């Protein structure tokens, strides 16, 4: 895969439930703590090394942001780093919440 694919929040959740992909939330720490998709990994500059240790380059990854814009850039970056199956969630966390998909809160 030389480019990422866009998927709906429902498609993303289905892949996560099947343990077929890792869900990476790139929103800031405050917003992630307030609410994030269930089972999401908070991907930041600080946690990137941990992410790389947990997931091989061929493991499917799904990137989610606020509205589905920033995740595209992050998806391209992951492809440039050698990840081969990368997806971006259309509409971001806003669409995830609107669709009533599971969320978690910290604290």
From Swiss-Prot:
Which Gene3D superfamilies does the record match to this protein?
Rhodanese-like domain
Every copy of the Rhodanese domain together lies at 17-105
SMART domains cross-referenced by the UniProt entry: RHOD
Per the record, the GO terms for biological process are: glycerol metabolic process
Entries under Pfam families matching the protein: Rhodanese
Domain of life, per UniProt, equals Bacteria
Question: What Enzyme Commission number(s) apply to this enzyme?
Answer: 2.8.1.1
Task: Please give the catalytic activity noted in the UniProt record.
Answer: thiosulfate + hydrogen cyanide = thiocyanate + sulfite + 2 H(+); thiosulfate + [thioredoxin]-dithiol = [thioredoxin]-disulfide + hydrogen sulfide + sulfite + 2 H(+)
Mind naming one GO cellular-component term on file for this protein?
Answer: cytoplasm
Please indicate if the UniProt record lists Transcription regulation as a keyword: no
Q: Which UniProt keywords apply?
A: Cytoplasm, Transferase
Q: What are the subcellular locations of this protein?
A: Cytoplasm
Q: Which PANTHER family match?
A: FAD-DEPENDENT OXIDOREDUCTASE, THIOSULFATE SULFURTRANSFERASE GLPE
Family classification: Belongs to the GlpE family.
Tell me, what does this protein do in biology? Transferase that catalyzes the transfer of sulfur from thiosulfate to thiophilic acceptors such as cyanide or dithiols. May function in a CysM-independent thiosulfate assimilation pathway by catalyzing the conversion of thiosulfate to sulfite, which can then be used for L-cysteine biosynthesis.
* Official protein name in the record: Thiosulfate sulfurtransferase GlpE
Q: Which organism is it from?
A: Pasteurella multocida (strain Pm70)
Q: What is the lineage of its organism?
A: Bacteria, Pseudomonadati, Pseudomonadota, Gammaproteobacteria, Pasteurellales
């Amino acid at each position: 895969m030389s480019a990422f694919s866009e998927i709906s929040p429902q498609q993303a959740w289905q892949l996560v439930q099947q343990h077929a992909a890792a869900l990476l939330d790139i929103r800031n720490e405050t917003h992630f703590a307030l609410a994030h998709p269930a089972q999401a990994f908070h991907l930041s500059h600080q946690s990137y090394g941990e992410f790389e240790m947990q997931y091989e380059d061929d493991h499917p990854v799904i990137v989610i942001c606020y509205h589905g814009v920033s995740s595209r850039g992050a998806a391209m970056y992951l492809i440039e780093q050698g990840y081969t199956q990368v997806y971006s969630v259309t509409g971001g966390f806003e669409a995830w919440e609107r669709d009533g998909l599971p969320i978690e809160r910290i604290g």
